[in-house]
UniProtKB/Swiss-Prot annotation:
Organism (species): Pseudomonas entomophila (strain L48)
Residues annotated for Zn(2+) binding in this entry: C54, C65, C67
Alphabetical keyword list: GTP-binding, Hydrolase, Metal-binding, Nucleotide-binding, Riboflavin biosynthesis, Zinc
Ranges in a coiled coil: none
Catalytic activity annotation: GTP + 4 H2O = 2,5-diamino-6-hydroxy-4-(5-phosphoribosylamino)-pyrimidine + formate + 2 phosphate + 3 H(+)
The protein's name in its UniProt record: GTP cyclohydrolase-2
Family: Belongs to the GTP cyclohydrolase II family.
Pfam families reported for this sequence: GTP_cyclohydro2
């Protein structure tokens, strides 16, 4: 996959001054961003997150999901550590796009869960692809991650690309009455590790 580095700049945030790296996936035209902090190319495991774009949660404060809260918590954790990386991937709505996500929300308003809604629209439950992460991490010199995620598919995707996941760091945040069914469905149907019994597990490739 031809993913090319375009430019980098400083990005001051309330948490830290990150370096923002821009990448272009020439095959899809999608623009992806990495926020980095500190020395991440020293060979040691780097605290990191793969975060798929969620306009409603990240920018519009939606409580239908936990995405915005996870994004903020991940950046705060990296800032506390003084070293880390966050890949912001343009895969809105688990890969189905913004307008289709709104269509899925409409079905959820009628009683469907998040997986059923995607499937009724003709999509897989999760259409995301993480192949673009490899060239971005290689460009930054990152070989091993302490991955902030509840999603075992992200761990497997990285290990399948020979990116070592030294540790899975649970990211449980943003729970509220509006996303209770959504989070339960992610655990029951998508295998997300939402409970304490899963903490510290690293699935083997």
């Amino acid at each position: 996959m031809p993913v090319v580095f375009v430019a980098a700049s400083k990005l001051p945030t309330p948490f830290a001054i990150f370096t923002m790296h821009g990448f272009l996936d020439e095959a899809t035209g999608r623009e992806h961003v990495v926020l980095s902090l500190g020395d991440i190319a020293d060979g040691e495991p780097v605290l990191g997150r793969l975060h798929s774009e969620c306009l409603t949660g990240d920018a519009l404060f939606s409580q239908r999901c936990d995405c915005g809260s996870q994004l903020e918590a991940a950046l705060q954790a990296i800032a506390r550590e003084g070293r880390g990386v966050l890949l912001y991937l343009r895969q809105e709505g688990r890969g189905i796009g913004l307008l289709n996500k709104i269509r899925a929300y409409e079905l959820q308003d009628g009683g469907a869960d998040t997986v059923e809604a995607n499937e009724r629209l003709g999509f897989a439950a999760d259409q995301r692809d993480y192949a673009m992460c490899l060239p971005m991490l290689e460009h930054l010199g990152v070989k091993s991650l302490r991955l902030m995620t509840n999603n075992p598919r992200k761990v497997k995707a990285l290990t399948d690309m020979s990116i070592k996941v030294a540790e899975r760091v649970p990211l449980h945040t943003g729970h509220n009455p509006h996303n209770r069914l959504y989070l339960a469905t992610k655990a029951d149907k998508l295998g997300h590790m939402m409970g304490n019994k899963h903490q510290g597990e690293v699935p083997q490739a």
